[in-house]
Amino acid sequence: MRHLQDQTVLILGLGASGLAMARWWVRHGASVTVADTREAPALLATLRQELPAVKFVSGAFTPDLVQGSAVRAVYRSPGLAPAVIAPVVDAARAMGLPVGGELDLFSRALADLREVSATEVVKDHLVPPESPLSDASDISDASDATDAVDSLEGEAALAADASGDIEEMSASDVVEGAPVSEDAGEDAALPALLAPAPAEQAAGYRPVVLAITGTNGKTTVTSLVGQLVQRAGKTVAVAGNIGPTLLDTLSAHLDADTLPQVWVLELSSFQLADAQDFEPTAAVVLNVTQDHLDWHGDMDAYVAAKARIFGRSTFMLLNRDDPRVMEMLPTPVKVRLRPPQVRPHSTFGAGEPQRPGDYGIETVNGMAWLVRAAQADETIKRRKGEEVELHIQRLMPLDALRIRGRHNATNALAALGLAVAAGCSLAPMLHGLREYRGEPHRVESIAVVNDVEYFDDSKGTNVGATAAALAGLGAERKLVVILGGEGKGQDFSPLAEPVSHHARAVVLIGKDAPLIRSALQASQVALLDAASMQEAVSLAAAQAHTGDAVLMSPACASFDMFDNYEHRAQVFCDAVQALAQEQGVVL
C-alpha cells in the first residue's frame, strides 16, 4: 500500500465514513483535507484530537477546493447528495483526478493485501501500533456462540426443536456436529465458492467477501450471515452500513494481526452508486422498493446502484419474488455448439424452489419448512430442455425461528444461501439460525398485554419495509398498525393491499398522515388519527381483539415528531409500558 504515501487528498463530508477515510489516508502517509458544509460537524472534535495534521474546511463545496490546489484525489462520504458535491466532483473529473468512496479504498486495500502476506504487511510497518477501534480483537467474535441445540436427526427431531424441547450442548461440540435434518446433508449439491487461504500464507490474503444490499432487511441479513459464518467455524468481520466502517474495521484487524477468513458487508445504495472494481465473492440484493429517490433522482438510478453490488463475476443470490431483482441477472451468453452460459446464481423466495440450489418455503401437513432444492440424481445426463427432477431438502420448521414473520423467513433463507456460497457447512449454521433473535426495532416483540402482542418496527421507515412487515406478521393474525411520520415523498398506495388483507385497523400519526389516509381510503379498514404516540397506542389497544398484534411500523422517517427512529421506538415502548400498568399487567 505504498502507493498511498505522499498523496494529497480531499475528503468530502465528516461523517463516520469521512473520518474513517481520513484515518486510512493518514496512517499511510498522505496529506489530507476534510471539507464539510457544516461549520462544526459532530465528529470535528474527534478529527482534531486524533488527526491534528488534517486540515478541516467548512462551507459550500465549490470547484476551488480542487482547482489550483495540490489535491490529487477526491473521496466522498456516502450520504452526501450528488447535487451537493457536483461542483467539486465535476471539477475534479475535468482535471483527470480520481473520485471515489470508502468502498473503493477498501476494495483496493484487499487487492493490495493479496500481493503480500499479512506477516509482511506488519514487517513493512504499514500499520501503526494503535487502532481506531478499542475492541479490535473482539471484532471476529461478532456473536455469542456459547450455547447450541443438540445434534438432531430427521424431521421428527426438528419438530421437537421447534417446540424448544431439545437439550443444549456447548458451542465447541456444534461446529463439527451432525446435520440438523437427514435432508440437510452436506453442501455438495450447492454452488459453494470455498474458503480463502489463511492470512499468513505466502500467497497473500484472500478472504471471502460477502455483500448484502436491498431496500429492507439489510441489517438483519448482514448480522445473521456474520453469526452463521462464525457458527460454521470461520473467523469473520462484519462491517459497512451496519457499523463499524469498512476501513476502521480493516485497520483494527491489521493492527491486531487478526485478518478474518470472511468479510460480511452491509452496503447501501449510497455506497454502491459510484463504486468501482468492487468484486465480492458472493452478493445478494434482498429487494428493491421506493426509497431515497430524492438522492438518486429516479427508480432506475436507484435499481442500478443496487445492482452494482454484483460486479462482473460475483456469484449472485437473487430474490425471485422481486421482478426488479431478477432483472439484474444478465441474459445468458450464447456459445457456439454449447448451451447458453448462465451467470452463476441461486435464488430464494417465499414459495417452493424450482431449480437446484434454490431456497424456499414448503408446507407439509400444515407445517411450514425452510427448504432448498437439489438435483435428485446428478449422475443422469439430460437432453436439452429436459426437466430436472428435484429433491427438496427440509432444513428446519419456520416455527423454530425466533425472528417473526414470513419476510424474516425469507431473510433467513438469504442468509443461509450467502453463507453456503462462502463454503460454510449447513449443519452448524442451522443451529445458529434457531438462536438468532433479530435486531432491535425490526419487528421486535416488546410486550404482551391482555393477549395482544406489541411489535416495535420503528426501523420500518419506508413503504416496502412496512408492507413486508404487514404481510409477514399478518400471516399469523390480524394487526392494528400504527403508520405515519415524514413520508419523504413516497407513494403510499402499495400499502393498500397488505392493509386490506392483514389489518383490523390503522392508527395514523405525524406530518404525512393525510397522505396515508388518502392512499388507504378504499381499503375498508378503520382509519383513526392520533396526535401523539401515547394516544396512538391507546387507540390501537382499544381496536385490537384477543390474539391480535399491534404493529408500530410507520413507513416514514421520524424527524417530524422524534429525534430519530430509536427515539420513536422508545416513546412507543414507554407508551406500551404505561398501558400495561394501567391495566394491571406486569411486564
Swiss-Prot record:
Coiled coil: none
Keyword Cell wall biogenesis/degradation recorded: yes
Pathway as given in its UniProt record: Cell wall biogenesis; peptidoglycan biosynthesis
One Gene Ontology biological process: regulation of cell shape
GO cellular component, one term: cytoplasm
Residue ranges with Low complexity bias: 132-147
EC number: 6.3.2.9
Region feature (Disordered): 124-147
Main localisation: cytoplasm
Keyword Cell wall biogenesis/degradation: yes
Annotated catalysed reactions: UDP-N-acetyl-alpha-D-muramoyl-L-alanine + D-glutamate + ATP = UDP-N-acetyl-alpha-D-muramoyl-L-alanyl-D-glutamate + ADP + phosphate + H(+)
A GO term, aspect molecular function: tetrahydrofolylpolyglutamate synthase activity
Family designation: Belongs to the MurCDEF family.
Protein name (record): UDP-N-acetylmuramoylalanine--D-glutamate ligase
Organism listed in the record: Polaromonas sp. (strain JS666 / ATCC BAA-500)
The gene coding this protein: murD
